[in-house]
């Protein structure tokens, strides 16, 4: 029978069509006919093979009603489809689903907001249905595109616009839930889909950042907020998406975030960028954190030539990311993070110096100075990131990072891994040194090693105490502060703050333990390095109050943490040597520096005498301090480091009772069982190869002079010069007298080698050997030059003046010289 005849006669139409037609009332406002809907549902459940036909017929009616704007019938058809979906769970539902999705697509394509919202709601209901066997051929490309477009709705009515955006976000959430649960269906993670989904969510999240900036772990908004606020709904959808991402999909989920922030220029005012990456870091699985950090580092490399504020924004995001990642797993990216940050630190310094050089030749300074300050922002952000990341690492990794950063500091004789600053010049090298030491200071903060040898291995200590890091006041301060972080294992530094004469050290409640055997061995091997650094640091003429305070704290911390009886004697020798520097003034220091050294020595010896609790020593120190209080207050730290302190014109007229005397100290300590033989030998710092090649002012000359004038005399023992007479000359010529003098010299040499410590003997021999080598080098340089021409003429070769040698037979000698 022809189909047309069946269409005219209702009784001859298929039963499923009659059942579908019966659910539509004459007046659409009456809604779905429930009795007939129950019949249709029973029929669909009883004959599931008819589901595909039912769905196709409903889709046909819905398409016709949409075209004719019969929206009442459209809503009835969608309600019927929803009920059939919820009631039927069989293999035959798959063809029916295709019809259902086709009808949802029709609604989403319409320009009517109500239909779009209704279609989205139906799709969300479908997404919440768990299918027994998922259909792998089904794709959701259209729905991803359409829901993403709805998230960017620009409808004129604000309320309608808000409803459409909420519907779009809920639709994306439905697509995500429907697809990401199945590991075999990974189409949703493809870049073409993520490039639509993620920016759509970020676009709506951005709308609430101005009024509500959420940080930390995922929030728990109320159900009402989720439904009414597109921003909160988008954020929860974003968290859910990231929480379902695997390692292979992480890159596709994070890359669109970078693209969105770049496109909308959100790095400079980076509150939203920071918020986004906090959400990312808290939402993803902990073992994937290092992958996100890698992506941020790659993005930072891509923007290395952009404006400073953009780079600073990216670094700030990195700081927030590593702050979260450092608490969990950070994978193999630890050194990569630091290496990349140090590279960008060098670039920033290079840009800053380049702008400074370019502005020096022009008359306009405003733009260049602004860029300089922006580069400082980048540098500070990098340092904060390095420090925060390093300080949150476990101790075993932190020690590696300390070595890694120290290896990058440009110093003499450092490792080949140090940063190349040859293109930056002296100023750039100094800036890099300061930046790296500031980073190192933050990394070492709170680090507690069991032994000082573990905290200060030779590979770390040698470059840290290098004279290359003593050329600037700020550099020396940073080095001392790093030493404080590593030496102070009992948190005593805060109690020592402020250089002063402490009346009773017991009131400070210093925490102290018995020095371990490992620490004793460390001081035997490296104690001379520490003493030398303190000694030379006091002699710098650009020292300020902070330098002396840090030097005092260093001496005090060494006393607390590392001092046994032998170290105490060495520290006293260093203190007396510093006092001699101020009194003799061989380095031509300013009066403030000389008085500052005297005040620092007074504060330290007062502290030391009370720490070792030798009554006679304490009495001598107290007596000197009382005398200074009466007659020489400028030798006390509380006075000399006070603002507008009046300085003396000279120190030539100082009294003997105003200074600390070696013989008095030796007597007091000797009576308490200390071995004071070393106190008779003045302290002399070691000379290193770097000193000889250093560009700094005469470290070698200063030390060499002290080596040459070594004698048993101290500040209080003045040797009278011998009066030269005819008789004394006769005795000098007499052979017997010469033999006695030789015997005396040999006796003194033997005594010195018997009593003096090995380090001092080695320092003296090394300094003299270095001087001898320098003299020999000068002599050899003179001897290998060709003899000058008798006429004194010069010849120019390749722009260089050269003397031409004349054969002997051509030389003209004076007549008196010719035989």
UniProtKB/Swiss-Prot annotation:
BP GO terms, sorted: protein localization to plasma membrane
Compartments where found: Cell membrane
Region (Disordered) residue spans: 210-230
Major subcellular site: membrane
Keyword field: Cell membrane, Lipoprotein, Membrane, Palmitate
Membrane topology recorded in Swiss-Prot or TrEMBL: Lipid-anchor
Matches recorded under Pfam families: EFR3_ARM
Coiled coil: none
Modification after translation, per record: Palmitoylated at its N-terminus, anchoring the protein to the plasma membrane.
Family: Belongs to the EFR3 family.
Subunit text: Component of a phosphatidylinositol 4-kinase (PI4K) complex.
The protein's name: Protein EFR3 homolog A
Species for this entry: Xenopus laevis (African clawed frog)
């Amino acid at each position: 029978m022809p189909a047309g005849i069946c269409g005219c006669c209702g009784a001859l139409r298929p039963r499923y069509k009659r059942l579908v037609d019966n659910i539509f009332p004459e007046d659409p406002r009456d809604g779905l006919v429930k009795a007939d809907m129950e019949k249709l549902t029973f029929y669909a459940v009883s004959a599931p093979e008819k589901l595909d036909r039912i769905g196709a017929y409903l889709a046909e009616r819905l398409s016709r009603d949409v075209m004719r704007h019969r929206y009442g019938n459209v809503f009835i058809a969608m309600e019927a489809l929803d009920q059939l979906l919820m009631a039927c769970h069989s293999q035959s539902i798959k063809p029916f689903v295709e019809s259902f999705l086709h009808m949802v697509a029709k609604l989403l394509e319409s320009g009517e907001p109500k239909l779009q919202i209704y279609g989205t709601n139906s799709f969300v209901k479908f997404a919440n249905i768990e299918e027994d066997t998922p259909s792998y051929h089904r794709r959701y490309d259209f729905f991803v595109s359409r829901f993403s477009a709805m998230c960017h709705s620009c409808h004129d009515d604000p309320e309608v616009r808000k409803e459409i955006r909420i519907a779009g976000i809920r639709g994306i959430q439905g697509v995500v839930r429907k697809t990401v649960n199945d590991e075999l269906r990974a189409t949703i993670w493809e870049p073409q889909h993520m490039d639509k989904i993620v920016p759509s969510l970020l676009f709506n999240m951005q709308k609430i950042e101005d009024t509500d900036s959420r940080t930390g772990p995922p929030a728990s908004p109320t159900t009402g907020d989720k439904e009414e606020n597109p921003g909160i709904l988008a954020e929860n959808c974003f968290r859910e998406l990231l929480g379902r991402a695997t390692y292979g999909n992480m890159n596709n989920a994070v890359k669109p975030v970078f693209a969105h922030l770049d496109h909308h220029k959100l790095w400079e005012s980076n509150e939203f960028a920071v918020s986004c990456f906090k959400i990312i870091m808290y939402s993803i699985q902990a073992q994937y954190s290092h992958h996100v950090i890698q992506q941020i580092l790659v993005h930072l490399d891509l923007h290395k030539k952009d404006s400073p504020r953009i780079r600073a924004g990216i670094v700030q995001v990195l700081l927030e990311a590593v702050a979260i990642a450092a608490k969990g797993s950070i994978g193999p990216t630890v050194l990569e993070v630091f290496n990349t940050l140090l590279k960008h630190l060098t670039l920033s310094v290079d840009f800053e110096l380049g702008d400074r050089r370019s502005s020096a030749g022009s008359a306009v300074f405003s733009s260049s100075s602004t860029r300089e300050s922006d580069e400082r922002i980048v540098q500070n952000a990098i340092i904060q990131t390095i420090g925060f990341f390093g300080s949150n690492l476990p101790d075993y990794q932190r020690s590696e990072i300390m070595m890694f950063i120290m290896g990058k500091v440009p110093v003499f004789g450092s490792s080949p891994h140090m940063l190349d600053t040859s293109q930056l010049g002296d100023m750039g090298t100094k800036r890099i040194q300061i930046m790296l030491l500031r980073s190192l200071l933050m990394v070492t903060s709170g680090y507690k090693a069991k032994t000082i040898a573990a905290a200060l291995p030779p590979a770390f200590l040698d470059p840290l105490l290098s004279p290359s890091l003593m050329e600037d006041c700020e550099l020396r301060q940073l080095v001392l502060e790093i030493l404080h972080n590593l030496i102070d294992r009992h948190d005593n530094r805060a109690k020592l703050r402020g250089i002063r004469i402490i009346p009773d050290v017991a009131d400070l409640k210093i925490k102290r333990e018995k020095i371990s055997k490992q620490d004793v061995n460390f001081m035997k091997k490296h104690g001379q390095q520490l003493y030398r650094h303190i000694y030379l640091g006091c002699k710098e003429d650009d020292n300020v109050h902070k330098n002396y305070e840090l030097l005092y704290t260093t001496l005090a911390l060494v006393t607390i943490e590392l001092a046994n009886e032998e170290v105490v004697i060495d520290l006293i020798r260093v203190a007396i040597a510093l006092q001699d520097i101020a009194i003799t003034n061989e380095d031509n220091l300013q009066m403030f520096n000389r008085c500052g050294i005297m005040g620092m020595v007074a504060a330290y010896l007062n502290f030391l005498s009370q720490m070792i609790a030798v009554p006679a020593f304490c009495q001598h120190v107290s007596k000197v301090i009382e005398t200074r209080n009466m007659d020489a207050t400028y030798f006390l730290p509380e006075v000399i480091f006070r603002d507008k302190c009046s300085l003396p014109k000279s120190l030539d007229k100082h009294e003997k009772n105003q200074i600390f005397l070696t013989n008095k100290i030796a007597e007091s300590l000797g009576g308490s069982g200390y071995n004071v033989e070393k106190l008779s030998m003045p302290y002399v710092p070691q000379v290193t190869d770097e000193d000889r090649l250093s560009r700094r002012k005469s470290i070698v000359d200063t030390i060499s002079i002290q080596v040459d004038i070594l004698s048993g005399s101290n500040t209080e023992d003045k040797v009278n010069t011998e009066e030269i007479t005819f008789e004394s000359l006769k005795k000098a010529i007499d052979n017997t007298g010469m033999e006695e003098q030789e015997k005396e010299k040999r006796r003194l040499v033997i005594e010195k080698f018997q009593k003096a410590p090995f380090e001092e003997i080695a320092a003296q021999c090394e300094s003299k050997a270095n001087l001898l080598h320098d003299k020999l080098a000068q002599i050899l340089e003179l001897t290998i030059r060709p003899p000058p021409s008798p006429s004194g003429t010069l010849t120019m070769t390749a722009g260089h003046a050269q003397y031409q040698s004349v054969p002997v037979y051509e030389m003209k000698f004076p007549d008196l010289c010719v035989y």
